[in-house]
Amino acid sequence: GRAPAPPAEPVALRASASYLVTGGLGTLGLAWTRWLVRRGARHVVLAGRHPPGAKAREALAALASAGARVRVVQADVASPAEVTALWRRLDDGPPVAGVLHVAGLTEDAALGATAWDSFARVLAPKLAGAANLAAAAAAREHPLDFFVGFSSIAALLGNRGQAGYAAANAALDAQIAELRARGVPAWSIAWGPFAANTRPEVLTAAQRRGIAALEVDAALAVFERLLAGPPGHAVVMAVDRARGEPPAGVANPALFAGWTGWSAAPPPAGAERDASAGAADLLAQLAGATPDQRLALLTDAVNATTRGVLALDPAFALAPEQRLDELGLDSLLAIDLVQALGVALGTTLPTTLVMDHPSVAAIARYLANELT
């Protein structure tokens, strides 16, 4: 929903307490660590699976010069044993007053091509990580002032190639709700894509749905408002309201009904009819064609559809045998291509089509064999 009104007073943190940030060495973890220090925190522990890189070390030096004691602990929060060891380290300092659970992992792939091991790896930091951290905190004498889980709009809108990530964040949202039911001041914030740490192709896919990139400073301002209010679940994303409709993929447009100028817009009149007619025309041409003509028609159709998905310059020569991943067709765009070809041909195609047949010519040959 919309951001709450700004708090009368900015959030003040305690210099006599410690604050834990998981995923603390990443772009967002460091941004929120700087916020903690600006708001008065003087003891911060950053947990991550890997040692700090050059940029993180530079950020840590700046935080130290600001008067904060920032410790880095290498730990996988999905491991109960490592979280237990982490909390023993925390017990050496002031009591922990707040947890920012930023840690997460993505392994994008079409669901049909996703192995369970990959799915489980993506679930682990969000689901097991939150459970392990909450259990460790509950075993301590001092209650938390806040526990904030960094979730994603993937749990609300879905995202092509991110079934595991969507499930992980939905599970995190549910787990945070359970913590609130047990009396823990816990927030779950489903963030939209950030400009600072999101791959360009993912931002492009989001923009096609009417979702803009979040800037960290704007997100921090909203975060502070949320933390000054009652614990709960919030969705924070930058949306292109000029579209005049909710973001594409929203299962319940009524969620956005209070936003002026938005409504549950139906598809353009005749859009489905036009798509069906186009598919029927192509299928009719294929039905009366010789094998060589069928292959040529399908090659042209795949070529045109690929150009549209990749937004290629009309002057660019797309070689039939060139691998599409060499042109920037990642797993998300590959799913777009499969769906677009399915519409063009009036059929459902396997989600692994591009993985199995990675060029225009290979896809056309596959279709020529399948559509006989």
Language-model features, listed with the residues they occupy:
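Short loop/beta submotifs within extracellular cysteine-rich repeat domains
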Residues: 44, 253-256
